[in-house]
């Protein structure tokens, strides 16, 4: 059966919309009140697009740089020029809220006697800071970063990091992600996969389908106890 459970970080354990949502809630920047969902969505989509384009063009840069670049694009798209807003959004992104189902899912892995680890596009400094701020480090055995291979998901070298770190076969790893394309790529690599389909999106038309599809991370506990 499983020997380790790997979790994606951004969008799976950490809420990527939280920076924009939390800043909007302060009313410090009134223009964000209605705009923040669109800003957060474009910021995230550009962030991911930049990972794919940089991987394809062999131009790796730390995920933090791509996060900043994506925010600059999104702000310009919405005619937002306030540098204080930019600084505030990035400060909040360093310390994203954990989803409410993140801690229970990690607790379930711990109670099953398995190591839980993160496998993320995030660079190591980002991950260390984010998970300390989220209060989840006590349940995480390791934080595995693509920084070690200089390429982003869905490159197979990223998923190989999990096998190398724990000296296990791919099929002995359960991988959990809220990104359908990430779950598909991990499955193609050989992991058993759970797609936490938070947004109720259609299944990606890719060569591999997730082994399990659930609306939240609550399924992790159910699956490990079955």
Task: Outline where the language-model segments fall.
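Short, acidic loop-to-helix structural element flanking the phosphoryl-transfer center
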Residues: 60-65, 82-118, 128, 156
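Alpha-helical elements of Rossmann-like donor-binding domains used by nucleotide-donor carbohydrate transfer enzymes
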Residues: 22, 42, 69-73, 88, ...
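Active-site neighborhood of HAD-like aspartate-dependent phosphohydrolases
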Residues: 1-45
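Asp-based, Mg2+/Mn2+-dependent phosphohydrolase catalytic module
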Residues: 1-5, 107, 119, 123-124, ...
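Hydrophobic alpha-helical core bundles mediating ligand binding, dimerization, or RNAP-core interactions
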Residues: 20-27, 43-47, 67, 89-93, ...
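Short, surface-exposed acidic
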Residues: 29-40, 78-89, 170
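A metal-dependent, Asp-based hydrolase signature
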Residues: 45, 49-87
């Amino acid at each position: 059966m499983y020997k380790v459970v790997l979790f994606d970080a951004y969008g799976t354990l950490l809420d990527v919309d939280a920076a924009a949502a939390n800043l909007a809630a302060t009313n410090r920047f009134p223009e964000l009140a209605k705009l923040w969902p669109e800003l957060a969505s474009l910021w995230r989509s550009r962030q991911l697009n930049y990972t794919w384009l940089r991987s394809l063009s062999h131009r790796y840069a730390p995920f933090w740089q791509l996060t900043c670049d994506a925010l600059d694009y999104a702000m310009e798209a919405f005619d937002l020029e306030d540098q204080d807003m930019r600084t505030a959004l990035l400060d909040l992104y360093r310390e994203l809220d954990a989803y409410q189902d993140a801690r229970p899912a990690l607790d379930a892995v711990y109670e099953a006697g398995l190591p839980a680890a993160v496998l993320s596009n995030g660079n190591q400094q980002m991950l260390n800071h984010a998970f300390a701020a989220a209060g989840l480090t006590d349940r995480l055995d390791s934080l595995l970063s693509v920084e070690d291979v200089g390429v982003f998901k869905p490159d197979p070298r990223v998923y190989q990091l999990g096998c190398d770190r724990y000296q296990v076969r791919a099929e002995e790893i359960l991988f959990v992600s809220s990104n359908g394309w990430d779950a598909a790529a991990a499955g193609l690599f050989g992991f058993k996969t759970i797609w936490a389909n938070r947004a109720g999106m259609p299944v990606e038309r890719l060569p591999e389908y997730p082994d399990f599809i659930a609306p939240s991370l609550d399924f992790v506990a159910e699956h490990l106890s079955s």
